[in-house]
Amino acid sequence: MTELARLKFYATQPHPCSYLPEEQATTLFLDPSQPMDTQLYASLSEVGFRRSGDHLYRPHCQHCTACIAARIPVADFSPNRQQRRILKRNAELQVIRKRPSFNEEYYDLYRRYIEQRHADGDMYPPSRDQFATFLVRDLPFCCFFEFRLHGRLLAIAVTDVLPNGLSAVYTFYDPDEEQRSLGRYAILWQIAETERLGLQAVYLGYWIKNCRKMNYKTQYRPIELFVNQRWVALT
């Protein structure tokens, strides 16, 4: 924490919250002039920071503490019955690690995902510029995990590979393959990959108790939440 105390951070002005419409949000950003090296990012992930594009951020709201960083300690994870079914259903998928890049195959999948799954969100309507700015970043720790079935692209898990674990940045998938539960499968695969790499945890971003879209995160047990400057197991 001593090194982190020397860093500069900037807070945004209050703005409408994307998850709790009745709330005003404030976000704390790492000084964008600070080089985002892998070790610094890992250290900040340990205190609840996330990456979006080229920025590291954390909620910094004055009157709300609903957004809580969440991670899965993979050594203790055991899939439940439903999760085992999802793993079996997708066992034939091939996963390929790629450097982040823009191509029409990726963008078409992203566009259809946003249009059919998140037309009510602040990422709608999708655009090529939005896709490139948000996800296609030339960072040494970032990769695209492609999930393919007989060559056909079904999903991409945008993932940061850090010394302390995998950070699940964003996953988008074929909305016509709903029966496969590809979003859940991507997390299960990231858990297995984290363990294979000998790393500690999968960082899932923020969990909000009263946000329906966030409920899926607590289906992975055990899960730890960053509360009062320390990680505690959710019971």
Swiss-Prot record:
Pfam families: ATE_C, ATE_N. It catalyses: N-terminal L-glutamyl-[protein] + L-leucyl-tRNA(Leu) = N-terminal L-leucyl-L-glutamyl-[protein] + tRNA(Leu) + H(+); N-terminal L-aspartyl-[protein] + L-leucyl-tRNA(Leu) = N-terminal L-leucyl-L-aspartyl-[protein] + tRNA(Leu) + H(+). GO terms for molecular function: arginyl-tRNA--protein transferase activity; leucyl-tRNA--protein transferase activity. One of its GO terms (cellular component) is cytoplasm. Keywords: Acyltransferase, Cytoplasm, Transferase. GO terms for biological process: proteasomal protein catabolic process; ubiquitin-dependent protein catabolic process via the N-end rule pathway. It is found in: Cytoplasm. Its main location: cytoplasm. Its EC number is 2.3.2.29. InterPro entries: Acyl_CoA_acyltransferase (IPR016181), Asp_Glu_LeuTrfase (IPR017138), N-end_Aminoacyl_Trfase (IPR030700), N-end_Aminoacyl_Trfase_C (IPR007472), N-end_Aminoacyl_Trfase_N (IPR007471). Belongs to the R-transferase family. Bpt subfamily. Functions in the N-end rule pathway of protein degradation where it conjugates Leu from its aminoacyl-tRNA to the N-termini of proteins containing an N-terminal aspartate or glutamate. This is Aspartate/glutamate leucyltransferase. It comes from Pseudomonas aeruginosa (strain ATCC 15692 / DSM 22644 / CIP 104116 / JCM 14847 / LMG 12228 / 1C / PRS 101 / PAO1). The gene is bpt.
